[in-house]
Structure formats: structure tokens, C-alpha cells
Amino acid sequence: MDETTLTPDRARQRFRAGLVRPAAGMAPGHAQANLVIVPRELAFDVLLFAPRNPKPCPVLGVLDAGETTGALLPGGDIRTDVPQYVVYENGVEVARPHDITPYWREDLVTVMLGCSFTFEDALQAHGIRLAHIDQGVNVPMYRTSRRCESAGRLSGPLVVSMRPVPAARVADAVRITSRYPAVHGAPVHVGDPGALGSRTWGHRTSATPCGSPPARFPCSGRAGSRRRPRWWSRLRRSPSPTPRATCSSPTPGTPTTRCPDGARERGGRALVHPCGVRSLPTRQPQPRPAVSRGSPVTPVARRRRLWLAALTRAGRGSRPVRHPGSPAATVPPGPGRRTPAPRAPRRCAPRSGRGTPCRRASRGTPGASSRGPGPCPRAAPVRRRPPPAPGGSAGSRPTWRPRRRSPALPAPRTRCPAVSR
């Protein structure tokens, strides 16, 4: 039976029966947890240490003193359902049993911390292969020079787990794991291991070897690899400064300092990790495309175009051209072209029956029209009384009357407030 497709219940049964192997890749889609079992007098320090260092020690649940099961593991037993335990006495390792029932006491408190094995199935679902799963070994872990924030009697350096990731998929790994903040989340570092206090990956805390495949380079990260963002398709065309990448993740064995989650874009071009290491190639800004004819034109540009078009048309003849804000100017005709005869200014006659000339009449002598003698065609028509009906007397009233207009009401009179006082 494929062990990578086991459900949590079946996996706990296999461990209880004596199966010893890392839980990496098992129970996909379910959260995995590390157990920290301490006496009651140290439980407060542990529960204070975890919130001060939330990235390496994310708390998933706590069991009261003497409890061996809970809501997070229905039907399970924390004394037998783990592949292997490490027993410490006075800070010294004394045993690695598969069953801690002989060591169990009623004053022991169990704290469950999130494990980075939880998001490994998501990484594999997006095509990011993990070396320790392919080789069937545990994830490698390293001790760094960074210190965790102490709490009571608990203190120590940051311990990270390392996962080799191809350089072209580092951004994908960062994005995927950042969606799991309860199980370490985004990497704590990506790139040169010297930033964590070691020139090479030599300060190991586990004896299980895990080699890096070709075309990968060591890159330290807090909790593994992530998924590709949308802008990575632009960055991947640039040459990579290094051939491969590895991500390191903190393990709950020792605490870590706080570090912001994930990588981010700084300046809109280069992907820079919060620790300050430039881990991805930069991309030079591209020139802005020219404005096409379909783009909106500003009012200033539109007036400039109209003015140039008027000058071009005026070059074919002598027509008055007026620029906004300048007096009228006459452009001389082009070579070999006749000068047209000057046009007479347009005149308008006053509107008969109104007593007020139209707007054109104020520009010249009333009575003249640009279309010839006679009144202006735009003048208001004159209403004349029709002749009397045939057979009627001269003194009889006509059958037609012009429409009478109601007299305008006078404007209301208002008194000045100062006078009314």
C-alpha cells in the first residue's frame, strides 16, 4: 500500500504497529504537528515562548496535564501514535523510543506545534519536487547563528530545515508556503547561507543526509518553497545569477527571531527577500509605448492641431485666419495661385416688429444682407392682419386675431434689511 495516500487514522495505526519512517508526504491535505511534552511547571514558559517566536513555534493545540488524546486526534494516543520520540532529562538526550508509555506521568502537558510537512503536498501538486521525499529520508535541519527571543528558562538559536528548490521555482515555492502561516509559513531566508551565520550547510542537527540534485543551489528559507506569482513569467526570462536555490525552514526544536512573511517586490522590478538578500534577477524598465491615434487628445493638443490645419488651408488662398488670443492675420497665397476677391461683410436687417436688431445687425449697417438686397432671412416674420372676408363690411371685426400675451408681472419689491430695522 502506498504510504503517501494514508489517511490520518490509518497513518496513526501504522505508527502504533511499529512503522518507523518520516511522516513527510503522508496524509495529504491534513495538518501535521510536532509534539512538545513538558512538566506542568515548564508549561507556562513554553506557552510564553511560542507567541514570542510564532514562526518556528506555531501552536496548533494544547492538551491538559495527563491527557493523551484530544479533538485534533480523535481516537489517537500521543504516547504511541508517533514514529519516534526523543526523551531528554536535564537537557540531555537519554533515549529514542517508539512508545513513551513507560515514561508517562500525570503532570505532563502536551503542546502541538505546526509542522512544515503540511504544505509539501501542495508544493508537489505544483510540480516542485522535494529531494528528501524522493530519497526517502527526513528533511535536513541546520543550526544558525540567529537567536530566538527567550521566555523564562527557554532560550536557544534558530534551527531551520532546508529544502532544495530550482531557481526558476523559488517564487512559486514562496507563494505556496506563505498560505500556511500556521505551519511556519514563508521561508526565513533564500540565497546565501552565510546570511544565517554559516558559509556552508555544515551545522546539521540531524544525521540524515540529503544531497542537492544538479541545477539547484543552496538558498535558506523559513518553511520551504512556494508557488509562482503572475509577474514571475517576466522575471524568468532574465539570466539567473546562480544556478540553483534551496529553502530552509525553522523546526520547532529551537526557536527563531521574527521575520516578515514571504518575499516582496521592492521598486516594482526586483524581488527582494525581507532579510535584504536580492534573490531574483532584476528586470530593466521598458520604454513607454508611443501614444496611438486612438488615444485621447488633450485640449491644448487639439487647439494646436486645428491651428496648424488652418495655416495649411490658408496657404492655398488669402483667407483671414484668427489664432485664439491674437488679432486677425492674412496669410499670403501660395505661388501660382489666384487671390480670390474679398467678400462683402455680412449684414443683417433689424427684426421687424420687435424693435431690437439681431446680433448681425450690430456689426454693420442695418438693411443689408449677404444674400442680396432685402431684409435678412433670419429676421423675425411680420404678423399682418389678413384682409376682411368677402361680403363683409369694412367695419366688421376680422375673423383672425393675433395671440395676446399676458402682461409680465412686476418684480416683487424688497426692502434693505438695514432700512427695515
UniProtKB/Swiss-Prot annotation:
One function term, GO molecular function aspect: lyase activity
UniProt feature, compositional bias: Basic residues: 224-237
Stated name of the protein: Putative hydro-lyase KRH_21160
Family to which this protein belongs: Belongs to the D-glutamate cyclase family.
Positions with biased composition (Low complexity): 243-260, 370-380
Keywords annotated in UniProt: Lyase
InterPro entries on file: D-Glu_cyclase (IPR009906), Putative_hydro-lyase (IPR038021)
Assigned EC number: 4.2.1.-
A Pfam family it matches: D-Glu_cyclase
Location of the region described as Disordered in the Swiss-Prot/TrEMBL record: 200-298, 312-421
Cited PANTHER family: D-GLUTAMATE CYCLASE, MITOCHONDRIAL
